[in-house]
Regions:
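Short, intrinsically disordered, charge-balanced linker/junction segments flanking boundaries
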Residues: 236-237
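Structured aminoacyl-transfer and RNA-binding surfaces used for tRNA recognition/handling
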Residues: 1-233
Length: 237
């Protein structure tokens, strides 16, 4: 908890008044995560109004129906001019304004051996921490969409140029297709750099499907010539 807070507020220098913490409120047979809440209060100086308690759906993480699991604690950032805690829990607006999760700390302390079975304490509990790198980049760069960060926006704009269209950052069919092409071109470049080629089996088939979907969305944009290699080359550059 202290490491996460130190990184976000001192290294990245995010304003603390735009951050809110969530912890597990407890459920039947599972205690509330009072320990995490107490540590957050000590580390941040926040009161209860900025350390929110949520249930299983939001603040209890598991790998699936079985396996390691445990309560989690999330850090959320507010996109917009006036951080409004009363809006917490709402989906961000179409323009991206609102609260968005940027960090999750999972306290792995239980194991579920069978689907629907009881939870047993893990002999060696651990902490699984996950931060959304592109979400954090969006926060730092002052944009509300991952596709508007410098690494992806250039690919989106290149796709728009090839298609002879304008990217507006909306949820229109054209803009969605441009984002798909940008994302999938990057995936294609990264996989091929690792030696994966489009084939008919295993991970090679996954790459083939990714490329096929990118090309399909290019066709939806009216692109009738080969184009995916151009966007992938920009990733390499």
């Amino acid at each position: 908890i202290a490491f996460a807070w130190d990184y976000l507020t001192k290294v990245v220098e995010l304003p603390q008044d735009r951050l809110v913490i969530t912890v597990f409120e407890g459920a039947e047979g599972l205690p509330a995560d009072d320990e995490a809440a107490a540590i957050w209060k000590k580390v941040t100086g926040f009161g209860d109004e900025r350390i929110l308690r949520l249930g299983m759906a939001d603040n209890f993480w598991s790998m699936g129906d079985t396996g390691p699991c445990g309560p989690c604690s999330e850090i959320h950032f507010f996109h917009g001019n006036d951080p409004d805690i009363s809006r917490f829990g709402e989906e961000p607006r179409i323009d991206g304004l609102g609260w968005t999760e940027i960090w999750n700390l999972v306290f792995m302390q239980y194991d579920r051996a069978e689907k629907g079975g009881s939870l047993e304490a893990l002999p060696a509990p651990s902490i699984d921490t996950g931060m959304g790198l592109e979400r954090l980049a969006a926060v730092v760069q002052g944009v509300t969409s991952n596709y508007d960060i410098d690494l992806l926006r250039e690919l989106v704009e290149l796709t728009a140029t090839i298609a002879g269209k304008k990217y507006t950052g909306s949820t229109s069919d054209d803009d969605v297709s441009m984002r798909v092409v940008a994302d999938h071109a990057r995936t294609t470049a990264m996989l091929m750099a690792e030696g994966v080629m489009p084939e008919k089996q295993k991970r090679e088939y996954v790459l083939r499907r990714v490329m096929r979907r990118a090309i399909r969305h290019g066709h939806r944009l009216g692109i009738e010539r080969p184009f995916l290699h151009e966007v992938a080359l920009r990733v390499v550059e």
